[in-house]
């Protein structure tokens, strides 16, 4: 995941994140003291009620979000060796701004005149 993908057929965070990814992000947002992948994995699977997501998927997602700056991470030592603890780098409102900025920035690079014109024509 080098960046986020936006599905124009969906709305809200559903356009950017799968259900389990939203839940994983919520777990970290609600844990200012930080959360490791095991904690996120357990809580997400409890929230999914009947469905499950692998710990590897959780780890890959958390790392991708850390790499693009949505989450912060700190490598710590503990029982069993090293592990990452993830912290919010931004809250939900900040994440929504981040998504918007990423999309608009990409559009401005690809279609600067058309993007400016389209933004003028949008009625809030």
Question: What are these model-derived regions, one by one?
Answer:
Residues 1-26, 31-34, 91:
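Short alpha-helical segments that sit at the start of domains
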Residues 17, 76-97:
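Short, cationic-aromatic polyanion-contact patches
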Residues 34-44:
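Short acidic, hydrophobic short linear motifs in intrinsically disordered regions
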Residues 42-55:
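Short helix-coil junctions and helix-kink-helix linkers
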Residues 58-68:
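Basic amphipathic alpha-helical segments that dock to polyanions
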Residues 66-76:
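A short, conserved structural fragment
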Residues 93-124:
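Amphipathic alpha-helical dimerization/coiled-coil segments
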């Amino acid at each position: 995941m080098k960046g986020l993908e936006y599905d124009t057929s969906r709305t809200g965070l559903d356009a950017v994140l799968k259900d389990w990814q939203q839940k994983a992000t919520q777990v970290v947002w609600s844990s200012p003291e930080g959360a490791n992948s095991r904690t996120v994995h357990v809580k997400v699977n409890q929230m999914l009620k009947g469905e499950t997501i692998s710990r590897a998927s959780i780890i890959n997602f958390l790392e991708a979000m850390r790499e693009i700056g949505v989450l912060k991470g700190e490598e710590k030592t503990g029982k069993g060796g090293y592990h990452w603890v993830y912290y919010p780098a931004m809250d939900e409102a900040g994440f929504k701004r981040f998504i918007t900025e990423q999309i608009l920035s990409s559009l401005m690079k690809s279609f600067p005149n058309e993007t400016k014109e389209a933004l003028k024509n949008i009625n809030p």
